[in-house]
Design a protein with these regions (language model features):
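Alpha-helical transmembrane segments in inner-membrane proteins
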Residues: 1-331
Length: 331
């Protein structure tokens, strides 16, 4: 007997709660369940374990939860926009733009504060998205996903080349940038930038209310127009959603690959193509993957730590190979 969609949502929610608790408990210092409960409900500022749980571990768990959900939903929206099951937010050049601004800030402007770098990465992601969409629509008023994808690929290669050139000329700063370039949520403090958390949450909620429009848009532009939808405006809203969600994620965690590609495909294999279900389910799966990958990154070479982007890259590559082997794609 197959499970109903609501059951899948419940299971994904339960998994998210479990991995979140594990994230608070696992690391170089193991925290027992009684200690965790004590830290959460009877906090003692003089207790090192309580400070660890509610400080760095809570912060990185929240960052992993938010970035995983944001990247996954941005990937789902990208696949709707392009009607391509292997599309991901990176096609807009978001990663390349954000990383370029981070590298420029550290090496040329000498910016080292986490808050300032997050702002620079976020602005870079948004500006590059605007540039890509502008080039994709150059000399034509109509939004064509194929042209935008080509523009995104070109701009990504251009900014990647700029980034590599700057790094080669400033090798002294390379070590400090490696973790950010590889994708990492260690040494991040969400409490220093609560506004970024608010932005991601607001756009995730707004994405859910876009679901009815996405259901219609997935038929065809002509049918959507015939049903009274303003297709051009919907596509521009989708572009905004992708750029803000993906840009926020890259700003917080660096360049994380594959989450926006594999999670929407997995969600569409499990649930029917109704975006009222797919959007929250995709967000839950993305959060579960990011938190799980972060846990693995902490313990696999303990006491050292791997960038979480390496773990998501390995997992994503394996899942993508499996999907390609099975020929399973559905938009």
């Amino acid at each position: 007997m197959s499970l109903k969609p609501i059951h899948h949502l419940f299971i994904a929610s339960a998994c998210l709660v479990i991995v979140s608790f594990l994230s608070l408990m696992i690391g170089n210092t193991l925290v027992s369940l009684p200690q965790l409960i004590q830290a959460l409900f009877h906090f003692d500022g003089q207790n090192d374990v309580h400070t660890l749980v509610t400080g760095s571990r809570a912060s990185r768990t929240i960052i992993a939860l938010l970035t995983g959900a944001a990247l996954a939903v941005a990937g789902l929206f990208m696949q709707v926009l392009t009607r391509n099951a292997v599309a991901s937010p990176g096609l807009f050049g978001v990663n390349a733009g954000a990383v370029f601004f981070i590298v420029t800030g550290v090496t040329l402007i000498r910016v080292h504060s986490f808050e300032a770098l997050v702002v620079m990465a976020f602005v870079g992601a948004i500006l590059v998205t605007i540039l890509v969409v502008g080039l994709g629509m150059f000399k034509q008023a109509r939004f064509t996903p194929q042209r935008v994808i080509l523009a995104g690929a070109s701009i990504s290669m251009l900014f990647t080349a700029f980034t590599q050139g700057i790094l080669i000329m400033n090798e002294t700063n390379l070590q400090g940038l490696l973790f950010w370039l590889s994708g990492s949520i260690s040494l991040r403090n969400i409490w220093d930038i609560p506004w970024m958390m608010v932005i991601i949450l607001l756009f995730l909620i707004a994405g859910f209310f876009m679901a009815p429009h996405l259901n219609i848009l997935m038929t065809s532009d002509e049918i959507a127009t015939g049903l009274g939808q303003n297709v051009k405006r919907i596509k521009w809203v989708i572009v905004l959603m992708i750029s803000v969600l993906a840009g926020s994620s890259v700003a917080l965690a660096g360049s994380i690959v594959f989450v926006g590609l594999i999670i929407p495909n997995i969600a569409k294999l499990i649930l029917p193509p109704r975006y009222q279900l797919l959007i929250p389910y995709t967000a839950l799966l993305g959060s579960c993957l990011m938190i799980s990958a972060d846990i693995v990154a902490r313990v696999i070479i303990r006491p050292l730590e791997l960038p979480v982007g390496i773990i998501t890259g390995i997992l994503g590559a394996l899942v993508l190979i499996y999907l390609m082997k099975k020929g399973i794609y559905r938009v």
